[in-house]
């Protein structure tokens, strides 16, 4: 399973670790992804999404029905 948020599209980024001596070694910054179940009232079922914590906050703000409609319009299976 890829490390991509289904709502925001956040993906891993690359950057550098920096030691005290300012040596640079490559590293990945991973999004804070959570597997989360959301209750869809209109369909009377749970939907499991892999979302970042920012995606969870967006769902709290917009509502799960709106977000699922956007995902389906994008062609994602929910």
From Swiss-Prot:
The keyword Cell inner membrane does not apply. GO terms for molecular function: structural constituent of ribosome. Keywords: Ribonucleoprotein, Ribosomal protein. Residues 1-21 are annotated as: Disordered. Coiled coil: none annotated. InterPro entries: Ribosomal_bL28 (IPR026569), Ribosomal_bL28/bL31-like_sf (IPR034704), Ribosomal_bL28_bact-type (IPR001383), Ribosomal_bL28_sf (IPR037147). Pfam families: Ribosomal_L28 (PF00830). One of its GO terms (biological process) is translation. GO terms for cellular component: cytosolic large ribosomal subunit. Belongs to the bacterial ribosomal protein bL28 family. This is Large ribosomal subunit protein bL28. It comes from Shewanella baltica (strain OS155 / ATCC BAA-1091).
């Amino acid at each position: 399973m890829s490390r991509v948020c289904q709502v925001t599209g956040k993906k891993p980024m690359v950057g550098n670790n920096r030691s005290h001596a300012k040596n640079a070694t490559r590293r990945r910054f991973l999004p804070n992804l959570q597997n989360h179940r959301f209750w869809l009232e209109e369909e009377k079922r749970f939907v499991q999404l892999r979302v970042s914590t920012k995606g969870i906050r967006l769902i709290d703000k917009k509502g799960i029905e709106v977000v699922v409609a956007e995902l389906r319009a994008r062609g994602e299976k929910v």
